């Protein structure tokens, strides 16, 4: 009697902040589990996204962007989370942006050179490159930097060549039993995903000052008798001025954030959601390792 073979492996998606790692993960999975915004440092935790197709299960780790600035405790922890993801995977997808190459890209590359896993280079946002003639010389420059498994120009936003990345991943998955049931798309809890959705809306609707200074704690997440979820979210900021910014004029901003977050939650959880949001000042949380631990920033290191 023949036993069907199965293939399974872990793939880290790495790169400097804001190159499109989370957008690529969402496209590879065919749905949204990692939060995205135009602001750098949107991803603060390692998100595991799972894509199962027949005998093949690819388990993607979406890391925080690696960067050289480590002044605050939260930045140091994010770098640690990203670095530790590189060490224990079968494959790495290194995401860079168009024809840009920065010291942070160089730093990520140096970390990858130290590792053993083969690396696919995904050159993202190629649709945004104004001077198309610059693209080929830049790809040749990148090819000279390391012995990449493959170099694929992509647009994570439009999906251009994302199927090529998925095919390369599938080809390099080792023979192994699947780690997760086939209907799983993430190993994160609904409570965690609710906090990430609220944080994404905060990033999307607030000014450039806020990304580092805001986080979300889910204080209550219960099923109700109507088959839906009652969720209470606490938004923590560092200063009184930021609290006013989050609430907005006559509460307009927090209302918009709540409406948009609720829509995404209902789509993700496939159930009606009753969401209530509060804002609280907790000064210095991003510098305080104990506070970060209590907010879940250290549990996956």
From Swiss-Prot:
Compartments reported by the entry: Cytoplasm; Cell inner membrane
This protein's assembly is summarised as: Monomer.
Identify the keywords attached in UniProt to this record, alphabetized. Cell inner membrane, Cell membrane, Cytoplasm, GTP-binding, Membrane, Nucleotide-binding, Ribosome biogenesis, RNA-binding, rRNA-binding
Start and end residues of each Era-type G domain: 7-175
Q: Where is this region: G2?
A: 41-45
Q: Which residues form the KH type-2 domain?
A: 206-283
Q: What is this protein called?
A: GTPase Era
| Residue numbers spanned by region G3 | 62-65
Tell me the domain of life. Answer: Bacteria
Q: Name the InterPro entries on file.
A: G_ERA_dom, GTP-bd, GTPase_Era-like, KH_dom-like_a/b, KH_dom_type_2, KH_sf_prok-type, P-loop_NTPase, Small_GTP-bd
Give the span(s) annotated as G4. 124-127
Which organism is the protein's source? Shigella flexneri
The record lists its disulfide bonds as none
A GO cellular component term found in this entry reads: cytosol
What this chain does, per the entry, is described as: An essential GTPase that binds both GDP and GTP, with rapid nucleotide exchange. Plays a role in 16S rRNA processing and 30S ribosomal subunit biogenesis and possibly also in cell cycle regulation and energy metabolism.
Mainly resides where? cytoplasm
Which residues does the record give as GTP binding sites? Answer: 15-22, 62-66, 124-127
- Could you cite one Gene Ontology molecular function of this protein? GTP binding
- What Gene3D superfamilies does the database record attribute to this sequence? 3.30.300.20, P-loop containing nucleotide triphosphate hydrolases
Q: Where is this region: G1?
A: 15-22
Note one Pfam family from the annotation: MMR_HSR1
């Amino acid at each position: 009697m023949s036993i069907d073979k199965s293939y399974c492996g872990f793939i880290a998606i790495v790169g400097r902040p804001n190159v499109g790692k989370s957008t690529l993960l969402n496209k590879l999975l065919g749905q949204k589990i990692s939060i995205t915004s135009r602001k750098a440092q949107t991803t603060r935790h390692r998100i595991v996204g799972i894509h199962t197709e027949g005998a093949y299960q690819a388990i993607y780790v979406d890391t925080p962007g690696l960067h050289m600035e480590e002044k605050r405790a939260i930045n140091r922890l994010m770098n640690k989370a990203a670095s530790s993801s590189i060490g224990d995977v079968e494959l790495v997808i290194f995401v860079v942006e168009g024809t840009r190459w920065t010291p942070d890209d160089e730093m990520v590359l140096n970390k990858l050179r130290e590792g053993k896993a083969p690396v696919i280079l995904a050159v993202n946002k190629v649709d945004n490159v104004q001077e198309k003639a610059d693209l080929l010389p830049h790809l040749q420059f990148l090819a000279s930097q390391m012995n990449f498994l493959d170099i694929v120009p992509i647009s994570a936003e439009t999906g251009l060549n994302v199927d090529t990345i998925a095919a390369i991943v599938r080809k390099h998955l080792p023979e192994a039993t699947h780690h997760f049931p086939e209907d799983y798309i993430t190993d994160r809890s609904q409570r965690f995903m609710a906090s990430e959705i609220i944080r994404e809306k905060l990033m999307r609707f607030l000014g450039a000052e806020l990304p580092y200074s805001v986080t979300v704690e889910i204080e209550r997440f219960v099923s109700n008798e109507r088959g839906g979820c009652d969720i209470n979210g606490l938004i923590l900021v560092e200063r009184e001025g930021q609290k006013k910014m989050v609430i907005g004029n006559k509460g307009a901003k927090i209302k918009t954030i709540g409406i948009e977050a609720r829509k995404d939650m209902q789509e993700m959880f496939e159930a009606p959601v009753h969401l209530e949001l509060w804002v609280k000042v907790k000064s210095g949380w991003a510098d305080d390792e104990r506070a970060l631990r209590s907010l879940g920033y250290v549990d996956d290191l």
